[in-house]
């Protein structure tokens, strides 16, 4: 396969895989009764995975503006998935906290990713796993540095 054809195939694969993951996960969440959008689920995930989840740190993790995050957080607060609490150490700061209502959503989300990765690596040999990881790390580094 020549380089130009390989680039086209790789581009097509990345676009298709990205879209498939989002749509399949959205469907899996809907089947479990979750009415949140994938964007809202990813905001919940970012809050859960951020050490000190304030507006700035969560927006940075998601690579969105604080204004965009504010809109999402307002919706998630109204839906009962997130609360805002004053930082006990610095009253000027507002921390974001998931409510118990978010726990099953995060469990479904995590289980989807666990199943997806298990399926991807199930038939790969160790050297293929390592090659896949190395390729994806290179791709991730490119996106992180370029954008």
Task: For each feature predicted by the language model, list its residue ranges.
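N-terminal leader segment of winged-helix/HTH proteins
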Residues: 1-34
């Amino acid at each position: 396969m020549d380089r130009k054809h390989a680039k086209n195939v790789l581009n097509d694969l990345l676009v298709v895989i990205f879209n498939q993951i989002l749509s399949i996960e959205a469907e899996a969440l809907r089947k479990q009764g979750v009415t949140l959008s994938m964007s809202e689920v990813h905001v919940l995930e970012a809050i859960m995975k951020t050490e000190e989840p304030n507006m700035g740190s969560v927006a940075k993790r998601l690579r969105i503006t604080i204004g965009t995050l504010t809109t999402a957080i307002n919706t998630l607060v109204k839906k009962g998935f997130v609360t805002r609490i004053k930082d006990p150490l610095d009253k000027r700061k507002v921390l974001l906290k998931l409510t118990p209502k978010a726990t099953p959503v995060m469990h479904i989300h995590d289980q989807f990713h666990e199943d997806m990765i298990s399926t991807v690596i199930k038939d790969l040999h160790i050297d293929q796993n390592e090659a896949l990881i190395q390729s994806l790390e290179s791709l991730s580094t490119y996106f992180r540095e370029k954008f």
